[in-house]
Amino acid sequence: MTSLIPPWERKMERREAEELLRNAVGNATAEFRKDQWEAIDAMVNRRQKLLLVERTGWGKSSVYFISTRILRDRGRGLTLIVSPLLALMRNQIEAAQRLGIRAETINSTNEDDWPVITQQILEDKVDALLISPERLANESFVEEVLLPVADRIGLLVVDEAHCISDWGHDFRPDYQRLINILRLLPENTPLLATTATANDRVIEDVKLQLKDIEVQRGPLVRESLALQILPLPDQASRLAWLAQAIPELPGTGIVYVLTKHDAKQVATWLNKQGIDAHAYYAGVEHADFENSDCYRQHLEELLLSNKIKVLVATNALGMGYDKPDLGFVIHYQAPGSVVSYYQQVGRAGRAIDRAY
């Protein structure tokens, strides 16, 4: 007599998971990149805690969304994704939908939707919930949303995990509240922490805080990127070079600046030269939009759909902005750190053979 294996105990095979990938990307021959399957296997078959350190554009979100799809099909609870930026959440929700995953977010921009989303979470109708680390400091969220479902969370994802460490370049104190959340979860709940920009010191700090976590570390080289340094001694020469070079660069791109003033100044200059450019920074507003978040989302969509040539942005446009065919990233001034530079140039060339 053949014994039936419950769906939550059946081992997922690579070929089955790869079929989910193919459905998501619409490519019948798509295959996992190096080490993607190993990370998925760690989540769904071995139920481990894993810190994934892989280059920008490698496909870290594919790992946790395919894992979510598998775990939900096995009857597990929702995936909780802690993510630092609204732009990142919007991109992730769209990526989840391609896998048939119902993803929702509770954040400062959708307060009117909170009661409906909360009820759907309690009824187990949501596959993935995306929140900011600051949401973990909200007592009503913890008591009304998190505590009632904590014992059945299927997967915890900590995106941009370098933010946990006070040695990290984007340290966010509320990320450390994750330690309290971990205590609420069943012991065998898998955890996936992801980053592209953690040095050895940050990795050791994350391991210390998340405890008993394995590390999977890949090469950080991006072969599709052609990097150049141009010695331009003053502002006038930099502006002149931008006006000459940007029309000749392929596709659309981002010019990174250090300040709000620079963003407005450079965007105005480029527009005067006939280049369709918009300034992007924290708090940027437009009379036609209700608030800054709505206008920033509009600007992101303009670039995503190639309706403008370039965004002139501060680091407000950073982690998580995902435009696979972004053709170029230019730094008008040197960024604050090498890690910030790596994060920002990593916006370009994710799904094209050559970017600048």
What is each PLM-predicted segment?
Residues 87:
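Conserved Rossmann-like nucleotide-cofactor binding loop
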Residues 14:
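Nucleotide 5′-phosphate-binding alpha/beta core
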Residues 80-81:
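Hydrophobic alpha-helical transmembrane segments of integral membrane proteins
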Residues 9-11, 20-23, 34, 38-61, ...:
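Helicase motor core with emphasis on the C-terminal RecA-like subdomain
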Residues 2-9:
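Interdomain "pre-motor" coupling segment immediately N-terminal to P-loop NTPase/helicase cores
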Residues 29-33:
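Short acidic-aromatic active-site loops that bind/stabilize oxyanions
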